[in-house]
Amino acid sequence: MPTINVKKADLERLVNMPLEDEFIEEKFPMMGVEVEGIFEEDGEKIIQFSINPNRPDYLSAEGLARGFRGIIGIETGLKKYDIESSDVKLYVENVETRPYIAMALVKGVIVDDYVLESIINLQEKLHWVMGRDRKKVAIGIHDADKVKPPFYYKEVSGDGIKFVPLNSDEEMTPREILEKHEKGIKYAHLIKDDKFPIILDSEGDVLSMPPIINGELTRVTTETRNLLIDVTGTDKYAVEKTLNIIVTALAERKYGKIHAVEVIKDNQSTIYPNLKEDVLETTSEYINKVLGANLTPGTIINYLRRCRLDAQFVDNKIKVFIPAYRVDIFGEIDIAEEVAIAYGYNKFSGEYPIIGTIGELNQLEKKCDFIREIMVGFGFYEVINLMLSNDEVLFKKMRIEDNNYIEVLKPASIEHRIVRKSILPLLMETLRINKHKELPQKIFEIGDCVVIDENAETKSRVVKKIAGVIVDNETNFNEIKSYVEGLLRELKIEYELDNFEHPSFIKGRCAKILKDGKIIGYFGEIHPEVITNFELEFPVVGFELEIE
């Protein structure tokens, strides 16, 4: 889990009360934050906190103080942040590689060395927790007084512009930054097809080249009083939430005032930041059933307010208002968790379930364990991938046209929005990630896939499958056929083989596996186009088989 260091004096200033060490160590765990240690550094008392990744709003002293004021009851409810209007505009051109951007101003901040360090630390922690090391989200924080609006967000070629990157005194082109600058070298893999996102002001000065580096021109110093924040990325939800976390944290500082920026794209205007709260509904009956408690609606509402939410009891339901900087509340169960946090986990007592049976391993899992032993005996290594992926990996790279799949309604990431119906594409992606490793590579995975089934109660069905791939200099159809037949023989499955045309395999080099006339799997030589799509350079063979 990420950790942050906070000066005790600063925390006391933000909480607005003196805090004893014992009080800190007792109360912060109540809000899900571990106190890793309290120590002296350069004459200052420092507190190290360990933050759960699902609470990125706690990655700053400001966010911690806001939550702490609620949990100890000195300031409860959803905090409202005033957003002042401005005439600042950002015009967005077609930026294919990072299509989403949000921007805001925070004026009147007082930045000393510690606050400056705190801002930079928050930025870097969010790059990891929200941004997947800048791949999904990248943040730029600038001295707003050094540039002149309106601003422009567009793509340029590698030699299309020159500017001085942060921590440098030399003008460079975007391509030169990737070759010479420390950050450019580190994040060069995030730039594709010689398309470089750039943020400019009205005079053509460069603020940022996301997700690589800011310009030296807008460096934030202790003299800075007005901050301009940009957040770019591949996921709109993550971009907007990241901006909300930053501006609300900065607004916790004395004199910090949030100012809006109008973002204009395709003749449509959006005002950022959008701090409108989300709304969910629950009931006291549901909360009490989940927690095993007997709380009145009024008590539940009070507990929610201590977690810095707001709530109202309307028509026998509890309407819950969730602040715009929270990214961890999606349904009723999350509301129940908030109540449990404020109520105090230490107040819950356990009960032994009244069960008169003895558990044992599921028969299907026993079969899967047996298959694992067989595959390891064949020299394969087991891998485990996520069940969520995207159409690029599951279909486009595999040369498959398929619209019959299950998609997540509100995905946390654009890269993880489709429930897989096949394991083979994810094994190809694993080979791509490990293409620098020595050959041969033989990997397999056993796992669940989800297919649409209109006759099922949930309109879907979970299918247990095994898939395997081999990449080597000279692998071929006969090699994968021998492994598949060996596996079927060990499982004592009576089967037939027949020719099969599958877009991911070479025509005439693919076979289907039939059991009682039904297709239960297939294998063969992967199509060269698929191999190229996954950036591989050697032949690949693979198979996929239903286990149940």
UniProtKB/Swiss-Prot annotation:
Q: List the disulfide bonds.
A: none
A GO MF label: ATP binding
List, alphabetically, the PROSITE patterns matched.
B5 (PS51483)
What Pfam families would the database entry show?
B3_4, B5, PhetRS_B1, tRNA_synthFbeta
**What's a single GO BP term from this record?**
phenylalanyl-tRNA aminoacylation
Start and end of every B5 domain? 275-350
Q: Where are the transmembrane segments?
A: none
State the UniProt keywords alphabetically. Answer: Aminoacyl-tRNA synthetase, ATP-binding, Cytoplasm, Ligase, Magnesium, Metal-binding, Nucleotide-binding, Protein biosynthesis
This entry's Enzyme Commission designation comes to 6.1.1.20
Give the location in the cell. Answer: Cytoplasm
The residues that hold Mg(2+) are: 328, 334, 337-338
Its assembly, as annotated, is: Tetramer of two alpha and two beta subunits.
Give the family per the record: Belongs to the phenylalanyl-tRNA synthetase beta subunit family. Type 2 subfamily.
Q: Supply the name of the protein.
A: Phenylalanine--tRNA ligase beta subunit
Q: Gene for this protein?
A: pheT
